[in-house]
Amino acid sequence: MKKILFSAIVALFAVSAVSAQDKGNWAVGPRMNLYTNTGDAVVGLGVFGRYSISDTWRIEPSLTALLHSGCSIDLSVDAHYIFHVAPYWSVYPAVGFTANDIGIWAAGLNIGGGFDLKLTSDWDLTAGLKWQPMFDDWRKNPVVISVGAAYRF
């Protein structure tokens, strides 16, 4: 399990991430997640990266440390389809995969969406909501609320 976890972390930082603006742009940033529908709410602090494949498509790998006893991390990779509502505002639906150990290790899907608000030429405020239906029968499917900042370069 440690080798798989280490490989996933290396892949996360090797691939990095996407920006909501133009093809080839990168963005990285901190994020705080709140995992609901887990019995007790679980808070997570982490990092994400974004890479714009085109003006409308980007990928976003993320790594989140879960701050709850008996939990450790959440690894996710999502694809976003960007709708540029205004020069400073964009919204996106998202779909992807996740693996985490809220109670026990399990893998699942990410289904949701979010928005980016351009604060400066390099910084965005980002927020999202996603449902994580897991591929096991034992635990509930978390709903994740996230808030973060993205530095674009």
Regions found by a protein language model. Give the residues of each.
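Short glycine/proline- and aromatic-enriched beta-strand/turn motifs that initiate or cap beta-hairpins
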Residues: 20-59, 63-65, 97, 146-153
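Residues that define the transmembrane beta-barrel architecture of outer-membrane proteins
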Residues: 24-26, 41-45, 69-75, 89, ...
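Cleavable N-terminal export/targeting peptides
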Residues: 1-25
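Transmembrane beta-strands of outer-membrane beta-barrel pores
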Residues: 32-38, 63-69, 73, 81-83, ...
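Structural signature of outer-membrane beta-barrel channels/translocons
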Residues: 50-52, 80-84, 116-118, 150-152
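Repeated loop/turn-to-beta-strand initiation elements of outer-membrane beta-barrel proteins
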Residues: 26, 55-61, 87-91, 117-125
